[in-house]
């Protein structure tokens, strides 16, 4: 029988010596005004692919964990609270019919799983833990952001992605909910409980001025109108090229967190990175962030000491050769390490 990630985690921690070193403090951020001590990373593994059509993205969390992510986090001085990458498997398997609602595909499944994720994220956040959610497709952000904002109503959201993921049930062409989470979080037209009671658990928690995008380069026409109509701040790859990533991150923070007092939720879709950096993802778009640009975003946010929740989404180990998969998983691990305080010096 294949060893589960949870069992492997338990075995490693029972059998392995403490990996902490005297250099831990050099890699650790200063004290957070929001997180409890000792610093604990609450890991939420989400092996879920129901928000999009490509098989394999559900394997992302297990690949990250089996590659050594939990030890990476511990080596940075964090305590790890982890219940197993397959913790949501029961919620995902269902024989219940799930017909389309309008254009939306598998809406009941997505709703059930994302509500479960919201509860899990909130449980970690309410204990003062920094939640690290491993996807899985980006529809999961309906749950992760909802859970974070329930614990921190004054939080802000930094969304790093090639795509805006802000289609509504009326504007989506594909009907895939990984392209819609932000519209539900904002409570846009077509997302109300009166129109889609299956998602009545989602309470609009996000204000347009509390979200900023970095890395956009593939936006649907309907999304472009939504972004303009709601005056949502966006930094596309044009802005990254024009100003440089350092200035872009500074401007992004100035917009959503001008006084640097609000908790930050960072939702990072690896397709924000150029396909040469993260090839094994379902909706890759050329012309993305470089390796260093992606990592700088995480480093700069870690430097604020305001990060309370992190998503790493859309790693798909079924796409590409083994070397491409290993490269993408390794990038996912290093993004998490940088967001949790790893520095060179």
From Swiss-Prot:
Catalytic activity: L-arginine + H2O = urea + L-ornithine
Cofactor: record remark: Binds 2 manganese ions per subunit.
Enzyme class: hydrolase
Cofactor: Mn(2+)
Entry EC number(s): 3.5.3.1
Binding residues annotated for Mn(2+) 2, in chain numbering: 124, 126, 232, 234
Matches recorded under InterPro entries: Arginase (IPR014033), Ureohydrolase (IPR006035), Ureohydrolase_dom_sf (IPR023696), Ureohydrolase_Mn_BS (IPR020855), WH-like_DNA-bd_sf (IPR036388)
Domain of life: Eukaryota
Alphabetical list of PANTHER family matching this protein: ARGINASE
Quaternary data: Homotrimer.
Stated role: Cold-active L-arginase that catalyzes the hydrolysis of L-arginine to L-ornithine and urea, an essential reaction in the urea cycle for toxic ammonia removal and cell proliferation. Is not able to use D-arginine or L-canavanine as substrates.
Protein name (database record): Arginase
């Amino acid at each position: 029988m294949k060893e589960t990630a949870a069992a492997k985690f338990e075995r490693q921690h029972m059998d392995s010596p403490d990996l902490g070193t005297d250099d831990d403090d050099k890699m650790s951020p200063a004290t957070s005004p929001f997180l409890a001590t000792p610093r604990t990373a609450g890991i939420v593994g989400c092996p879920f692919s129901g928000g999009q059509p490509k098989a394999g993205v559900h394997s992302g969390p297990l690949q990250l964990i089996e590659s050594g992510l939990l030890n990476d986090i511990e080596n940075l001085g964090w305590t790890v609270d982890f219940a197993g990458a397959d913790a949501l498997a029961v919620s995902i398997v269902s024989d219940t019919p799930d017909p389309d609602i309008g254009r939306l595909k598998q809406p009941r499944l997505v709703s059930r799983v994302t509500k479960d994720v919201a509860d899990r994220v909130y449980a970690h956040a309410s204990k003062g833990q920094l939640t690290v959610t491993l996807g899985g497709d980006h529809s999961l952000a309906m749950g992760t952001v909802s859970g974070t904002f329930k614990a921190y109503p004054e939080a802000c959201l930094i969304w790093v992605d090639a795509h805006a993921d802000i289609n509504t049930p009326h504007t989506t062409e594909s009907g895939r909910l990984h392209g819609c989470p932000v519209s539900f979080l904002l409570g846009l037209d077509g997302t109300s409980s009166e129109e889609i009671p299956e998602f009545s658990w989602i309470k609009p928690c996000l204000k347009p001025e509390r979200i900023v995008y970095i890395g956009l380069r593939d936006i649907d026409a309907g999304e472009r109108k939504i972004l303009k109509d709601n005056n949502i701040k966006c930094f596309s790859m044009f802005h990254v090229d024009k100003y440089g990533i350092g200035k872009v991150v500074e401007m992004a923070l100035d917009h959503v967190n001008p006084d640097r007092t609000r908790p930050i939720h960072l939702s990072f879709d690896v397709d924000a990175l150029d396909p040469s950096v993260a090839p094994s993802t379902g909706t890759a778009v050329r012309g993305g962030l470089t390796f260093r640009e992606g990592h700088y975003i995480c480093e700069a946010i870690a430097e604020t000491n305001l990060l309370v929740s992190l998503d790493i989404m859309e790693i798909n180990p079924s796409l590409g050769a083994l070397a491409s998969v290993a490269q993408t998983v390794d990038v996912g691990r290093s993004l998490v390490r940088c967001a949790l305080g790893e520095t060179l010096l």
